[in-house]
């Protein structure tokens, strides 16, 4: 094999290892780059999207953020919080919960103008599922996240 081809192969492999799409976490539990929406997304749940559930990717200091443990939507005891294990949207067995792997009525993600960005769901077979690493990280770790939302915000963002 020529040096030029070998160099290209090595560069290609190195670029894959450093890819911005790598979503693994480091030894401290911090996540590398994960794909996140570039615009703030609002979560709506319920049969007709009648329940506002907070902002998916806002700062943990935003009062409407799901990452603000002192706010309505980041508090694991609030009925409109996805972190409430006993609530409609946080119980993994409820069809309206994003954490139900077979859920048929998961929350939707919309921007401030109402544009649809997909379903927020652990159900990987749901048509029009939101395709962000952030969704995967949340759905795979929600039980741990709900115990320390602020710390997880720091790990992810």
Task: Put a short name on every predicted segment.
Residues 21-157:
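Repetitive, compositionally biased segments used for assembly/scaffolding
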Residues 11-19:
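Hydrophobic h-region of N-terminal signal peptides that target proteins for export
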Residues 1-5:
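Positively charged n-region of N-terminal signal peptides that target proteins for export
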């Amino acid at each position: 094999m020529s040096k030029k081809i070998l160099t290209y192969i090595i560069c290609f492999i190195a670029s894959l290892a450093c890819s911005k799409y790598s979503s693994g976490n480091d030894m401290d539990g911090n996540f590398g780059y994960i794909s996140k929406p570039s615009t703030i997304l609002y979560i709506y749940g319920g049969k007709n999207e009648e329940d506002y559930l907070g902002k998916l990717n806002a700062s943990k200091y935003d009062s409407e953020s799901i990452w603000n443990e002192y706010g309505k939507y980041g508090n694991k005891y609030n009925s409109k919080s996805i972190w409430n294990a006993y609530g409609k949207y946080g119980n993994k067995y409820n069809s309206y919960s994003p954490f139900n792997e077979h859920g048929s009525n998961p929350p939707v993600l919309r921007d401030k103008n109402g544009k649809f960005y997909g379903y927020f769901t652990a159900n990987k077979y749901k048509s029009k599922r939101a395709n962000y690493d952030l969704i995967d990280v949340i759905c795979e770790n929600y039980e741990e996240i709900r115990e320390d939302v602020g710390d997880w915000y720091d790990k992810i963002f």
